[in-house]
A protein has these predicted regions:
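Long, internal scaffold/assembly segments composed of regular secondary structure
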Residues: 202-239
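TPR alpha-solenoid repeat register
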Residues: 50-51, 123, 161, 195, ...
């Protein structure tokens, strides 16, 4: 048994867990390197979270053709459920629900994980995307808000949690606070493309178009290339 950089226990070798840590770091940056690092983590059959991350990546693509890839990943698990830690079993339940077409149920399972393990960044990030896909504005805010107490500014990835919270605030029409938190997020990590996305939303929703254009132009090198969100953020820039 090992522990990740946020102190969460999990099965797998220290080397595989280090790969998983790097994969999650790429995930919150929307970087393509997440795919290879997740595969590296999953190459250790005992690192169940690596396999689950691969399943989540397939599911988050929202392509029907990738649902089978997610199912195949779970089918290939060589460790039985009894060999999993409770948090890992909960992730398996969430992924299985999503594969079965119950995205809301998957989101609820991930919410339960986040309540018990608020520093589970994978549960927060994947759950946040489910809230986005399903249009659950309130939980876009509250899923992250409930976990904030467990994080501090000393945590290297705290800024990315702030970026998610900023988007949740914006979707609940709390524009001033959203912009404030979002700006803190992108100041902490210039490549926080989701945080950038949150801030530009606040400008759009308040009709502050010149401010939004200036913001996106000033940070263009941070969001325009090297991430999965660049086309979406380009669309916001065009707006």
């Amino acid at each position: 048994m090992s522990a990740d950089q946020r102190g969460l226990a999990m099965t797998g070798s220290p080397e595989a867990v280090a790969c998983l840590d790097r994969a999650i770091d790429h995930l919150i940056r929307f970087q393509i390197e997440v795919v290879d690092e997740a595969a590296n983590a999953a190459s250790d059959p005992s690192c169940v979270m690596g396999t689950l991350l691969r399943a989540y990546l397939s599911l988050m693509s929202t392509e029907d053709s990738n649902v089978k890839k997610a199912q195949d990943a779970l089918t290939a698990l060589s460790i039985t459920e009894t060999g999993l830690l409770p948090r890992e079993r909960a992730h398996l339940d969430a992924a299985s629900r999503w594969i079965a077409g119950d995205m809301a149920g998957a989101g609820a399972s991930l919410d339960a994980i986040s309540v018990e393990h608020p520093r589970d960044l994978l549960a927060l990030a994947v759950g946040h995307q489910i809230d986005f896909f399903t249009g659950n504005a309130r939980n876009l805010r509250d899923r992250i808000g409930r976990a904030l107490y467990a994080w501090s500014r000393e945590d290297p990835q705290f800024g990315f949690v702030q970026g998610m919270y900023a988007f949740g605030l914006e979707e609940c029409n709390v524009y001033g606070r959203s912009e404030e938190i979002g700006q803190q997020a992108v100041e902490a990590n210039a490549d926080d493309v989701w945080g950038i996305h949150a801030v530009v939303h606040t400008y759009e929703m308040q009709g502050e178009i010149p401010e939004g254009v200036r913001f996106m132009k000033a940070r263009k090198t941070d969001w325009a290339t090297g991430n999965f969100l660049n086309v979406h953020n380009s669309w916001h820039y065009a707006l």
